[in-house]
Amino acid sequence: MSCAVKIDQPATLVYRPRRPERTRLYQTIQNELESWLEIRSLEDLPVFVEKEFRSFLRCGILAYGFARAHCSHCGYDFLVAFSCKGRGFCPSCNTKRMAETAAYLTDRVFPKVPIRQWVLSFPKRIRYFLQHNPVCIVPVLRIFVRAIKKVLVSVSKASDSNKLGAVTFLQRFGSSLNLHLHFHSVVIDGLFEGEGNFYPVGFLSSKTVFEAQKEIQRRVVKFFLKRGFLEKEEAQNMLNWKNSGFSLDASVLIEAEDRVGLERLIRYCARPIFASSRLESAGDRLKYILSKPNLKGEKVLLLKPFDLLDRLAKLIPPPRYHRHFYHGVLAPNSPLRAKIKAMAGKEPRLARPELQTIIGKDEQTSQASSVPLNSLANSVNEEKTPHKISFGWAKLIARIYEVLPLVCPKCQEEMKIIAFIEDRPTIQKILNCLNEPTEPPPIASARGPPEMEFDYDQSCEYDD
């Protein structure tokens, strides 16, 4: 079924193709990239970093190719430039990837049960170890997930053999464009047993979360001690610190009916590292407006162009770097994964409604009930549930900007993509007809270092 439908809206509410070459981010990279690469050539700059920057300069530029959308009713056409599909800092591609991930998890993965966000941050030394030794990320993540499950078992009074369901997002950045690796886990607020019965969680106190934080701290420090990253005395000092730098938060709970809130939460967890709308010029520098004040109380960052490129380069993930992980019943090898996904977005049925969870004033008064969800899962035809969902470009645009891109702005009829143009002569011919630039924006060549200024006279005149 086509995602474009006839709508009764004013003609002004239409999709307008973006113009990346007009943004401050594009212009900065366009003018400074070659000079920056020339200076950084003396360093060990990863190849994938340069590739990411060069791909970004091709993203959204019509001269590199495009798709053609056509309205058969009135003959109106418009062009959609190809994207770079970068995984680094490209705001457009990462925004679409964020929307696709959130839509997929909300519509096709998470059942309609309460969902809680767990956020784990580390002290600077541990962050340094994780950033420079990616092989350590998965073991530390495993410690984190086991601690969450231990909390869910204790609060729900379920068996330790039951399984949780979670998706963890690895965020490598902070709000100030700084390296700050931390975990965001979107966790089903309960446990599943072997047949698919669900045990919801009752009251979760701050004391329980703090005890889980101390357990994570102890096990993570022990892990790095065994791996030789820490000396015994250093590890003991980290365990005795009053302000350890470890932080565990589980205060955000999304109710079962709030699917819009769930999608908003997942978008936050999968958000891009950079927002181009916050970048402005400030004389010979750049001003990046922060989403919230940093530790110094600053609301803006004043950066030189090279400083911006340095920060972006550090935040580009290496190839084949996983951005999110599935755990428990949502893991790829879980025998319950198909059943849980079949229940995505469905209302769970209570076999015995009189045994609903009793929420007490503290964690000791919480009693759990078993909610058989397997009967609901069996009622869903799994053959009709696609194994892989691909959200098209038009659907993502509509979901992000609430604008239907394949609706004709002239007659409000449906438009269709009729061709993908990659041939250079054809590209130039079409762009000429539309009075669009046939050549991509020129990339400034590398500049030499500035001439040094001396205060003393360097003339060849001598006194007799």
Predicted regions and their residues:
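Beta->alpha loop/short-helix hinge microenvironment recognizer with preference
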Residues: 1-464
